[in-house]
Structures are given as structure tokens and as C-alpha cells.
């Protein structure tokens, strides 16, 4: 009954206030008077730029409707004077003074100086100012100026239409400054401001605007969805935004950002999922932004056609700013800074940004007496202690007779400006004056609603209090119902029931679902967007519980689906289940002891990990190869996402790939992922491949690039191939990296070749995951020795001019260090002379010697065996330590034979596919040359002598001739 009574009471008050609001004549007339014209007007915003133009833009599309040219907002000198240069801010008229090449902010602005003038500063500066007000009416549809009203005269250009004409008020402030000691030093400025500050600022505006500091580039976002609505380039710095309504201008808030920062935002806005949150849109509280965490305040000093100016703007960590500490002469060393740990520095100190140490002459204003000004971004200056004393005072009441004493208030110093906080009050007073009855009706409704909320909270408190008296509790959920987290509130232990099954919950733990529990106090790690990883249990097994905010439930489900498909591989983190409550999603994952980043940075972790470093690298590559074979691109490979599991019952540890939150599947029939709004710019700064930033699509090579950075990071104990974090991503885009620290490794040539191939700027030229696994860097000693023997057998009987022999003997003297006989020990040298002759500069003969000594190892003299060491490790190291380029050289040369059955286990399919057309072409050329040579030999061979048949003689004729006397 009580609940029904309160409900009916609340509904009655709500209906009563609504009827009063609707029946109010003023309220109804105001709303009826709002026709199509006002709706069109309210959707128009006016953008004021420094050159004096007022542009009307459509608030939905950003399309320019019309332009009105007025006087420039700011006119100031463009020259720099010693000790007498002021930089005005065109946004609010605040002033900055340049002294000794250092900027300081004055505690007053131009309008305040004009109101207080004539006045004198404590630094000897004399101030004089004037003010001029003017009203002008415009047609909101065309922007045509209809009428001008001022104290001097009233000009009417065309007949004014009271229904359509909107009057805008503008105030012109002129201020002059004089040095009382030096009359040659003067400074003048004119500042124009519109009268929008007299009306309440629109706080419920559905859009959020950002403007650049040095040109008129504007970005507009939807506050609720975070979607970018439109962009516009006005070519001149923006100084103010107004909402155009029938009652005048309403000032709109906007953020000023650096030009380079705006370009980065515009370039990445469709690819970075985190930009809406970074920019402060699509948040629970629109006024609460994370700009201070991502951007930093700075002062931009610029130059326009109307003089020098300064605007406070937000910049990112890549923007170079000038520090006043480095622009002046060297100073005495100050006190030592407070000693802070690295963790305290990250928590309390802002991140460093680059500082210009040399003055670029192209952006410097200099004077003959040594004063100079740098155009660009400066560290936000400190405020000076300057004050001004007014020289005249308002006289209260009527004037007294001549000779009487006028009581004047004591002089007051005009110091730092305190922000006026009367906007809310003026807005409430405006509602009360224009619509009193709806105002009071709204108050009554809010009061009734407050009583209802208090009553409902009290009722829930009573129910919770009665529930807390229970000794234990059970939850029985049917399949398909939503699961919620529960925890026991008993002193020692509670019980948790699921389908009448009781599970004990340790004190301080939380239970989600039937089998999953976690400890909120035992945090294993944190991620972006509120993701936290806790230690927990799943069905009695220790697991890591990853908690994801419900707003990102789509990503949590996608991660769970990808894990279900890929966690059968031993080097992909195992997935157990996913539970949910009203606020979060919980993923139960395999518990690991450390990440690869912990392994590199913490020595105690290295002592507890039993797996070799090279095995960690190979297993991580194996897991990545499995993902790529499953058509999955990880997109966030970094040392923190390569984990080392707990030791198994056999004491074995494994390296696994984790964090599938940014993974994407390559669709069937495609080879890449398009970079759209849904896909976004994925990855972690410093580990992102260059094509992610500059290409329209990405694919598997992005993971290979990140893995190459990880390899170098691990092999060099924490060094990144692209340098320090500040310039790392820029170096990645430019392809500037160094691998000089690999020279300390025994296999430096193999490591250098592997990582260089993985960091290639061209994605198509990078190795695949299978090719990385087949690289000789990961071969065991047995496999390397067997490879040398197989190559030696292959080229033993080959002719010297055969393709494979020519490849092996190319640059042979570099490979064998001039002559390999000079690098081996005397015992082995003498043993080689006993059997056959070897060429000291031939790689093929070196391989033959290694093969023969390996096959006849037991027959070698004792001193030779001691020099060579045991097979395979010491024997192999004997030769590779003397000839470090040998294995890589032979591996590259013998790619020609990768398609042969003997070498298929040494090369990946990618190498065979790459070499197949080369081998085919070379074989075709060889065959053609042989045919031409055969034809040439046949053509040059001597012709055989013709054999003539002997003549048969007639014996009868011979007889006749021999015996002529016969007859």
C-alpha cells in the first residue's frame, strides 16, 4: 500500500507540473513562436577567425552557409622591442610579456586594462585605453548586414525585418602602453569581442569542437557516440565559436590544439579505437576528459597579417616545445632535485617532451639589442607579479558642491584575474524571469522525485539489512539466466550454491558463475579501457581471470571465440570459460608466472625460468605461425603479450601468445584486413609496423615486424632496434633502425640476417612465420652439422661452373677470412695434408674437410680430436667461431637446391616458391647454352674425305694395247 501511494503521488505531481507548463501563456507562446526559421537558426554556428571573418556553418554537416567580413579580431605590432614586447591572446585578450627572451603571462587582459585605464603598473608602464560599442543587425539566412547602431550614428543599409533580423553586439578595445622613462617605447593593440558573454553559455550542446592553433582547421565530434561529424579548414586561426539564435549569440566551448597534434588526430581518427575516449567524447561525464593524460598545455606563438599573437593550446608528446630554461644565458646550478624512484617518477612527473637547444634562425624575430622571439610552441609560461593601480575612481551617489570633500574608496591593486563563476546563476535567473510558472513547477517535480528516490533507497537498505542476517546464502539459476558475481559476508567463510551445489568461497574473494572465483586484491596486471587481470580459480584449477568492462563485450566475445579456435596449440594461451555479471565479462585463462618483458627486465624472473631464451623465441614464433595458419592476425605483438607458463608436472615451461583483444580474422578469399572504422589502428606505440600507419590494409607481416622488434629486445637485454620511446614510432615510419648490439652474440650474422628480414619496410619482403621457424638461427647443432654434410655431398661432384658451385664460391675469400687453412690449428692442418689436397680459399673444400673429419672422427689422432672437441656442439663451434659467416653464406647459396628432396627439411615453402622461377630460368639458359655450344662444335668439325670407287678396266682392251702385233 505504501509503495502504491508513493507511486501515485509521484505520477500526480509529474502530470500537474506538465499541465502547468503547457498551459502557461508565456511558455506556450514562446514555443509557438519558434517556427522553422528558429529551428534553422539554432542549427547554425558562427565561427570567428582572427582576420575578422564571421562564417556561418551548419552544425550538422559543417557546410559554410555565408561569410561576413568585419574588422580583424586583433591588431598588434609585428616587431620585437627590447623589454617592451607584448603578445595578446585573440581568444580572450590576455597578455604575455617578452623579457630577456623569456615569456611571462600578465595577470590581467586587455578589457580589464581598458576598464581600469588610465592606470600605471608597478614596473613603470603607463596604460591608456578606450572602448567602442556597436550593434549591427544581420539576416541569419544570407549574412547580409542590415543595420548598424552605435553612439555616433545609425546606418541602415536596407529595411530591417524585425522577425528575421538578429542583432549582434561588438566591443572594440584599444589599449596603449608607454614607458615613463623612455618615450620611444610604445605599444598599441586593438581587440574586438562580441557580446555573447552576457548570455548563458550553452552547456548541453551535443557536439564537441576542436580547433588548431595556427590555422583554421576544425574537428567536430558527437558527444554521445564519439563519432566525428565533420571537419572544416578555414585557413585562419579560430578565436571563438557561437550558436546563432534569435536572441543573439551563445558562446560555444572548444579546445585549441597544436597543428601537428590536430593532423595526427585527423590522420588516425578512423583507425584508433581509443581516440573518442582520449578526446573526451563518448564518456560518462562529457565534461570529464582524459586530455590531460594524453596531451599537454603549451603556448603557441604565431604571426599573422595583423601582428604577433599567442594562444594556449594542447599538444602531444611528439610536439617540440621551447623551454625558457634553455633560451637564456647559463645560470647557477640550483638545489638538487628530490630523489624519486622510477615508479614514483612515472606516477608523479609528467612525461618528457623534446626541447629545442639551438635557435632555428628561420623562425626567430631578433632585435639589434639582443632580444629575440621564437615562433612555435613554448612551455606554458609562469604568471608575473605585475600589478596596476587605477588613477581614477567611480564616485558613488550625486556630485557634491564645489569645495566639499568626496569620499573615495582606497586604491585597490588589479592583480591576477579570478574566473567569474556566474554563468549558472545567470541562466537560472533568466529562466525565472522569462518563465516563472514552469520554473516553480519544475522545482516541485524535482522535489517529489527526490522524496521518491530517498524512500526507495531506504526500502532497499531495509531489505539488505534483513538479508545480511542470514548465515549463508544459495543462488539457483536456470540455464540461460544472467550470472552475477556474489561474495560471502561472513566472518570466516561463506557458501556459494549453483543448482543446489555448495562451493566454499574464501574470505575476500568474488564468485562468478558456478566454477569461477577470483581475488580482487591479487592483481596480476592491467590493460587499457579498464581491463584488469586477477588471480583466481576455475573448478579447483589456478587460473588468471581477465575482467573486461561490459561496454567492450563485443571484443570480449571475439577474444573468447578466437581463443576457443586456437588454444589447442601448446604455444597459445589456454582458454577455459567466460562468465558475466551486470557490469563485466570474465575470461578464465591459463595462469602464467611472468611475461617476456618481466623476463628481460627482472633478474629474479630469469633465475626462476628454466626454459632457454632461444626456445622462448622459437615457441613464440610457433604460436604465431599457428595463428597465421588459422587466418588470424594478432596485431598487438609485444613483450608483455608473450607469457611464460607455470611449470608442468615434468618441470617444463612454455612460451605462449596471449591478449587476443585486438586480433582480427582474415576473411576467406582475402589476404589482408582493411583499415576502416571498425578495424582501427591496432597495436602499441613503438611496436607497430609502418604500414599500419600509412597503408589502407594490413596483414600477417605486421606481426612479423613486431616479432622482429621483440627478438632484438630479448637478445640485447632490453634494447629496442628503433631507439628510445620518444622517437621510436617516427623511426619506424622512416625505416631507421640499428642492430649493432647483436655483435656480442656468437651467431651475430644469423641474428642480424633474421631480424633484418623481419624488419623490412616492405611487408611483402618480410619472412613469414614458417620461414622464421626454418631459419638456421633456430637450428640445433646436430641439424647444422647435418646440413653442412648434405651440402658437401651435393656439390662434391659438381663442375666448377655449375650454378650451385658458383653461388657457394661467390665472395669465398670473405667467408673463409682470406684462407681457411690459416685459421685452423696445426694438428688439424697436418692431418689434412696426409690424405688429399685442399684449396685454402675454397668454401667447397672447407665443407669437404668438415664432412670428412666428422665421418672419420673416431679415426683421427688424439690431439686432433681434442682440438675439434666433442660432436656436435664443440665440433661445430670450432669451425663457426673461426668462420662466423659460413653457415649463413652456405644457407643463402644453397637456396638454389631448396626444391630437392634432401633440402626440403631445411627450407620453408616460401623459399622454394621464391626460388622456383629462378631455377627454372637458369636451367633454361644453361640448356640453351649447351645446345648452342654443341651446334658450334659440329659446325667447326673437319669435313670427311670423299672415297671414290676405283675404275674397272676392260681386260680385253688392255690385251689389245699390250699386244699390238696380235691380229
Curated annotation (Swiss-Prot):
Residue numbers spanned by region Disordered: 474-494, 948-967
Substitution effect: residue 723 to R: In zc14; loss of adaptive protection conferred by non-lethal hypoxia treatment. Prevents transcriptional up-regulation of apy-1 upon ER stress. Reduced UDPase activity upon ER stress
Lumenal face residues: 22-438
Recorded phenotype for the gene knockout or disruption: In combination with RNAi-mediated knockdown of atf-6, causes sluggish movement, arrested development at the L2 larval stage, and lethality soon thereafter; larvae have intestinal degeneration and develop many vacuoles in the intestinal cells. In combination with RNAi-mediated knockdown of pek-1, larvae have intestinal degeneration and develop many vacuoles in the intestinal cells. RNAi-mediated knockdown restores fertility, reduces the accumulation of unspliced tra-2 in the cytoplasm and suppresses germ line masculinization caused by RNAi-mediated knockdown of rnp-4/RBM8A.
Bilayer-crossing regions: 439-455
Keywords noted in UniProt: ATP-binding, Endoplasmic reticulum, Glycoprotein, Hydrolase, Kinase, Membrane, Multifunctional enzyme, Nucleotide-binding, Phosphoprotein, Serine/threonine-protein kinase, Signal, Stress response, Transferase, Transmembrane, Transmembrane helix, Unfolded protein response
Cofactor(s) the record lists: Mg(2+)
Active-site annotation: 636 (proton acceptor)
Topological domain ranges for the Cytoplasmic compartment: 456-967
Record PTM Phosphoserine, positions in chain: 672
Protein kinase domain sequence ranges: 518-778
Cysteines paired by S-S bonds: none
Ways its activity is controlled: The kinase domain is activated by trans-autophosphorylation. Kinase activity is required for activation of the endoribonuclease domain.
EC assignment: 2.7.11.1, 3.1.26.-
Record InterPro entries: IRE1/2-like (IPR045133), KEN_dom (IPR010513), KEN_sf (IPR038357), Kinase-like_dom_sf (IPR011009), PQQ_b-propeller_rpt (IPR018391), Prot_kinase_dom (IPR000719), Quinoprotein_ADH-like_sf (IPR011047), Ser/Thr_kinase_AS (IPR008271)
Domain of life the protein comes from: Eukaryota
PTM annotation, UniProt: Autophosphorylated mainly on serine residues.
Biased composition (Basic residues): 957-967
Biased segments, Polar residues type: 479-494
Catalytic activity: L-seryl-[protein] + ATP = O-phospho-L-seryl-[protein] + ADP + H(+); L-threonyl-[protein] + ATP = O-phospho-L-threonyl-[protein] + ADP + H(+)
Compartments reported by the entry: Endoplasmic reticulum membrane
Annotated GO MF terms: ATP binding; protein serine kinase activity; protein serine/threonine kinase activity; RNA endonuclease activity; unfolded protein binding
Free-text function comment from the UniProt entry: Senses unfolded proteins in the lumen of the endoplasmic reticulum via its N-terminal domain which leads to enzyme auto-activation. The active endoribonuclease domain splices xbp-1 precursor mRNA to produce the mature form which then induces transcription of UPR target genes. Unfolded protein response (UPR) transcriptional activation by ire-1, as well as translational attenuation by pek-1 in a complementary pathway, maintains ER homeostasis. Regulates the transcriptional up-regulation of nucleoside-diphosphatase apy-1 and many other genes, upon ER stress.
Official protein name in the record: Serine/threonine-protein kinase/endoribonuclease ire-1
Organism annotation: Caenorhabditis elegans
Gene name per UniProt: ire-1
Amino acid at each position: 500500500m505504501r509503495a502504491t501511494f508513493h507511486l501515485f503521488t509521484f505520477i500526480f505531481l509529474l502530470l500537474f507540473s506538465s499541465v502547468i507548463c503547457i498551459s502557461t501563456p508565456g511558455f506556450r507562446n514562446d514555443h509557438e513562436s519558434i517556427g522553422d526559421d528558429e529551428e534553422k537558426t539554432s542549427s547554425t554556428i558562427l565561427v570567428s577567425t582572427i582576420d575578422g571573418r564571421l562564417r556561418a556553418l551548419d552544425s550538422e554537416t559543417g557546410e559554410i552557409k555565408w561569410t561576413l567580413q568585419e574588422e580583424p579580431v586583433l591588431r598588434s605590432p609585428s616587431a620585437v622591442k627590447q623589454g617592451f614586447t607584448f603578445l595578446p591572446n585573440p581568444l580572450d585578450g590576455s597578455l604575455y610579456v617578452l623579457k630577456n627572451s623569456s615569456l611571462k603571462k600578465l595577470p590581467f587582459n586587455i578589457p580589464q586594462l581598458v576598464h581600469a585605464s588610465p592606470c600605471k603598473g608597478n614596473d613603470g608602464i603607463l596604460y591608456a585605453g578606450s572602448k567602442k560599442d556597436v550593434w549591427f543587425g544581420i539576416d541569419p539566412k544570407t549574412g547580409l548586414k542590415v543595420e548598424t547602431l552605435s553612439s555616433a550614428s545609425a546606418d541602415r543599409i536596407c529595411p530591417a525585418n524585425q522577425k528575421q533580423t538578429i542583432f549582434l553586439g561588438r566591443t572594440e578595445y584599444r589599449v596603449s602602453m608607454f614607458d615613463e622613462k623612455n618615450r620611444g617605447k610604445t605599444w598599441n593593440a586593438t581587440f574586438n569581442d562580441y557580446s555573447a558573454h552576457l548570455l548563458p553559455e550553452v552547456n548541453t550542446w551535443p557536439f564537441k569542437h576542436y580547433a588548431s592553433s595556427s590555422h583554421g582547421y576544425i574537428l567536430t565530434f558527437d558527444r554521445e557516440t564519439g563519432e566525428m561529424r565533420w571537419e572544416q579548414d578555414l585557413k585562419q586561426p579560430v578565436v571563438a565559436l557561437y550558436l546563432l539564435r534569435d536572441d543573439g549569440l551563445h558562446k560555444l566551448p572548444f579546445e585549441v590544439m597544436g597543428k601537428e597534434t590536430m593532423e595526427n588526430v585527423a590522420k588516425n581518427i578512423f583507425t584508433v579505437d581509443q581516440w573518442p575516449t582520449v578526446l573526451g567524447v563518448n564518456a560518462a561525464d562529457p565534461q570529464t576528459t582524459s586530455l590531460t593524460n594524453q596531451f599537454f598545455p603549451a603556448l603557441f606563438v604565431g604571426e599573422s597579417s595583423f601582428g604577433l599573437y599567442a594562444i594556449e593550446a594542447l599538444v602531444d608528446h611528439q610536439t617540440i616545445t621551447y623551454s625558457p630554461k634553455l633560451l637564456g644565458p647559463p645560470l647557477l646550478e640550483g638545489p638538487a632535485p628530490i630523489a624519486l624512484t622510477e615508479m614514483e617518477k612515472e606516477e608523479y612527473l609528467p612525461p618528457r617532451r623534446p626541447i629545442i637547444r639551438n635557435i632555428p634562425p628561420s623562425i626567430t624575430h631578433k632585435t639589434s639589442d639582443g632580444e629575440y622571439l621564437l615562433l612555435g610552441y613554448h612551455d606554458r609560461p609562469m604568471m608575473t607579479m605585475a600589478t596596476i593601480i587605477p588613477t581614477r575612481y567611480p564616485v558613488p551617489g550625486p556630485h557634491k558642491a564645489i569645495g566639499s570633500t568626496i569620499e573615495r574608496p582606497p586604491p585597490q591593486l588589479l592583480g591576477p584575474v579570478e574566473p567569474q563563476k556566474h554563468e549558472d546563476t545567470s541562466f537560472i535567473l533568466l529562466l525565472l524571469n522569462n518563465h516563472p510558472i514552469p520554473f516553480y513547477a519544475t522545482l516541485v517535480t524535482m522535489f517529489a522525485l527526490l522524496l521518491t528516490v530517498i524512500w526507495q533507497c531506504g526500502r532497499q537498505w531495509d531489505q539488505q539489512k534483513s538479508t545480511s542476517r542470514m548465515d549463508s546464502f544459495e543462488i539457483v539459476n536456470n540455464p540461460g539466466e544472467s550470472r552475477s558475481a556474489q561474495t560471502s559476508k561472513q566472518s570466516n567463510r561463506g557458501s556459494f550454491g549453483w543448482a543446489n551445489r555448495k562451493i566454499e568461497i574464501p574470505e575476500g574473494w568474488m564468485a562468478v558463475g558456478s566454477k569461477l572465483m577470483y581475488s580482487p586484491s591479487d592483481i596480476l596486471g592491467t590493460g587499457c579501457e579498464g581491463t584488469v587481470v586477477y588471480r583466481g580459480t576455475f573448478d579447483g584449477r589456478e587460473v588468471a581471470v581477465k575482467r573486461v568492462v561490459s561496454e567492450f563485450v563485443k571484443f570480449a566475445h571475439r577474444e573468447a571465440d578466437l581463443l576457443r579456435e586456437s588454444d589447442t596449440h601448446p604455444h597459445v594461451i589456454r582458454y577455459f570459460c567466460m562468465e558475466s555479471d551486470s557490469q563485466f565479462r570474465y575470461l578464465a585463462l591459463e595462469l602464467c608466472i611472468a611475461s617476456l618483458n618481466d623476463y628481460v627486465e627482472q633478474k629474479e624472473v630469469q633465475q626462476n625460468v628454466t626454459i632457454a631464451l632461444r626456445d622462448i623465441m622459437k615457441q613464440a614464433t610457433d604460436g604465431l605461425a599457428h595463428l597465421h595458419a588459422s587466418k588470424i592476425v594478432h596485431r598487438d605483438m609485444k613483450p608483455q603479450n608473450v607469457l611464460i607458463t607455470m611449470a608442468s608436472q615434468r618441470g617444463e615451461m612454455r612460451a605462449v601468445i596471449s591478449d587476443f583483444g585486438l586480433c582480427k580474422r582474415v576473411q576467406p578469399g582475402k589476404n589482408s584486413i582493411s583499415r576502416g572504422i571498425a578495424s582501427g589502428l591496432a597495436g602499441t606505440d613503438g611496436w607497430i609496423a609502418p604500414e599500419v600507419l600509412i597503408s589502407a590494409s594490413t596483414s600477417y607481416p605486421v606481426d612479423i615486424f613486431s616479432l622482429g622488434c621483440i627478438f632484438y629486445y630479448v637478445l640485447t637485454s632490453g634494447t629496442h632496434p628503433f631507439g628510445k620511446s620518444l622517437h621510436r614510432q617516427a623511426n619506424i615510419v622512416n625505416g631507421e633502425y640499428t642492430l649493432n648490439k647483436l655483435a656480442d652474440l656468437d651467431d651475430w650474422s644469423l641474428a642480424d640476417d633474421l631480424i633484418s628480414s623481419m624488419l623490412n619496410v616492405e611487408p611483402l619482403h618480410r619472412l613469414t612465420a614458417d620461414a622464421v621457424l626454418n631459419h638456421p638461427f633456430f637450428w640445433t647443432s646436430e641439424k647444422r652439422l647435418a646440413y653442412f654434410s648434405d651440402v658437401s655431398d651435393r656439390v662434391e661432384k659438381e663442375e666448377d661452373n655449375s650454378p650451385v658451385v658458383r653461388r657457394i664460391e661467390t665472395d669465398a675469400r670473405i667467408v673463409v677470412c682470406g684462407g681457411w687453412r690459416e685459421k685452423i690449428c696445426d694438428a688439424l692442418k697436418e692431418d689434412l695434408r696426409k690424405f688429399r689436397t685442399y684449396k685454402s680459399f675454397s668454401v667447397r673444400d672447407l665443407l669437404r674437410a668438415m664432412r670428412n673429419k666428422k665421418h672419420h672422427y673416431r679415426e683421427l689422432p688424439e690431439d686432433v680430436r681434442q682440438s675439434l672437441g666433442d660432436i656436435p656442439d664443440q665440433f661445430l663451434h670450432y669451425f663457426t667461431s673461426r668462420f662466423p659467416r659460413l653457415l649463413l653464406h652456405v644457407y643463402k647459396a644453397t637456396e638454389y637446391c631448396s626444391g630437392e628432396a634432401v633440402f626440403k627439411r631445411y627450407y620453408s615453402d616460401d623459399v622454394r616458391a621464391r626460388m622456383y622461377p629462378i631455377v627454372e630460368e637458369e636451367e633454361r639458359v644453361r640448356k640453351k647454352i649447351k645446345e648452342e655450344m654443341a651446334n658450334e662444335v659440329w659446325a667447326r668439325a673437319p669435313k670427311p674425305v670423299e672415297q671414290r670407287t676405283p675404275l674397272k678396266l676392260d681386260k680385253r682392251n688392255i690385251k689389245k694395247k699390250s699386244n699390238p702385233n696380235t691380229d
